[in-house]
Each structure stands twice: as structure tokens, then as C-alpha cells.
């Protein structure tokens, strides 16, 4: 659904406003890694105000919370001691995967500069081979 994908892509980073990321003019109190789950919480909490049901907002909230890296697993959250509710945040739907894949090519600190595939792989390397393998699978599937 291209309309959903476009809207979800526009909303997926909304939680950044609650994070402490001065380099991109965000002065919240949470760590950057939390921006996806914070965005999902914001959407769920405000949906009624916007006249949107919980069921209607949920797919957008899922995109927010599942786009970090190539997804985060319960185990990764525990092992890395991330400040997130320990559970799986893995992109499942095609739309979640497309947005997560596309997001890897851009950085909030350099929004006009698109990364190369090698640049994305380099940035994912510090998190382990699993993320690289997922990205490469998506690249074969969606390839820019």
C-alpha cells in the first residue's frame, strides 16, 4: 500500500523529539535508541485525539518501533543493556521492511547525503553480522 508506506515513512522518526540529540536540535530526556518506541507510544497515545482508532494507528506505531537498525531482538536488548522494554522489534510486514531498509541509507545528521550500500554495511558492522545479513537480503529484495 503506497499511501500507507509514504505516511508511515513520514512518521517513523516522530519520537526523536523526545530524545537528547543536540546535534539534530532535539533536547529531550531519552537516549536516541528510544526514538522508535517513543514514537510508537506517541502515536498510540494521541490517536483518539486525531479521530483515529487504535487499530488504525497500530500499523504506523509498529513501523516506528521496528525500524531501528534492521530490527532489534529481545536478546540484543538484554545483551546490550538497551533502555528499551525487552521484546522483539523486528520488521515483519513488507512496508515495515521497506521503510527500515530505506532508512539505512540516510542519517539525521547528514540528511542530504545518501549512503552507499557499502556505507550502510559499514555502519551496521558494529552491531554484528546478523544485521548485515538482513540488510543484504532486503537489498536483494528491494535494491535501490
Predicted regions and their residues:
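Divalent metal-dependent catalytic cores for phosphoryl transfer on phosphate-bearing substrates
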Residues: 1-119
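Charged phosphate-binding loop/patch that engages nucleotide di/tri-phosphates or the phosphate backbone
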Residues: 127-144
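C-terminal/domain-terminus segments
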Residues: 117-131
Amino acid at each position: 500500500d503506497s499511501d500507507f508506506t509514504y505516511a508511515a515513512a513520514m512518521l517513523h522518526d516522530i519520537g526523536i523529539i523526545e530524545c537528547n540529540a543536540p546535534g539534530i536540535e532535539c533536547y529531550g530526556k531519552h537516549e536516541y535508541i528510544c526514538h522508535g518506541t517513543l514514537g510508537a507510544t506517541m502515536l498510540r497515545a494521541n490517536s483518539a485525539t486525531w479521530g483515529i482508532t487504535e487499530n488504525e494507528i497500530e500499523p504506523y506505531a509498529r513501523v516506528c518501533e521496528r525500524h531501528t537498525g534492521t530490527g532489534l531482538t529481545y536478546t540484543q536488548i538484554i545483551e546490550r543493556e538497551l533502555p528499551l522494554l525487552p521484546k522483539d522489534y523486528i520488521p515483519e510486514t513488507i512496508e515495515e521492511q521497506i521503510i527500515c531498509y530505506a532508512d539505512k541509507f540516510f542519517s539525521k545528521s547528514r540528511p542530504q547525503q545518501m549512503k552507499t550500500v557499502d556505507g550502510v554495511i559499514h555502519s551496521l558492522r558494529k552491531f554484528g553480522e546478523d544485521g548485515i545479513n538482513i540488510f543484504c537480503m532486503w537489498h536483494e529484495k528491494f535494491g535501490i
